[in-house]
Amino acid sequence: MTIRPLHDRVVVKRLEAEEKTASGIVLPGAAAEKPDMGEVIAVGAGKIGKDGARRPLDVKVGDKIIFGKYSGQTVKADGEELLVMREEDIFGIVE
């Protein structure tokens, strides 16, 4: 199943969480925080402004991004957990 986001929405796959702390302590799955970084796997066509013109998104497929811990809506596609969020929920692109 492929998800094609609409308007200014973005589909993101979370990057794998760190399973060890900086001091080397291994965290069990429940204790590890969900990462706030991900990779963009699909983008919408852009938001339509008040003038009727479509504004393309600043992010593109393949970008690594940072977003808030509670950003987006979790969806499952082909057994994989993905996030669908608006572009405004993205803090920045990791370069």
From Swiss-Prot:
The keyword Chaperone applies. Pfam families: Cpn10. Belongs to the GroES chaperonin family. The gene is groES. It comes from the Bacteria. Heptamer of 7 subunits arranged in a ring. Interacts with the chaperonin GroEL. InterPro entries: Chaperonin_GroES, Chaperonin_GroES_sf, Chaprnonin_Cpn10_CS, GroES-like_sf. Together with the chaperonin GroEL, plays an essential role in assisting protein folding. The GroEL-GroES system forms a nano-cage that allows encapsulation of the non-native substrate proteins and provides a physical environment optimized to promote and accelerate protein folding. GroES binds to the apical surface of the GroEL ring, thereby capping the opening of the GroEL channel. It is found in: Cytoplasm. The keyword Repressor does not apply. Keywords: Chaperone, Cytoplasm. GO terms for cellular component: cytoplasm. Coiled coil: none annotated. SUPFAM superfamilies: GroES-like. PANTHER family: 10 KDA HEAT SHOCK PROTEIN (PTHR10772), CO-CHAPERONIN GROES (PTHR10772:SF58). Its main location: cytoplasm. This is Co-chaperonin GroES. It comes from Neisseria meningitidis serogroup C (strain 053442). GO terms for molecular function: ATP binding; metal ion binding; protein folding chaperone; protein-folding chaperone binding; unfolded protein binding. GO terms for biological process: chaperone cofactor-dependent protein refolding.
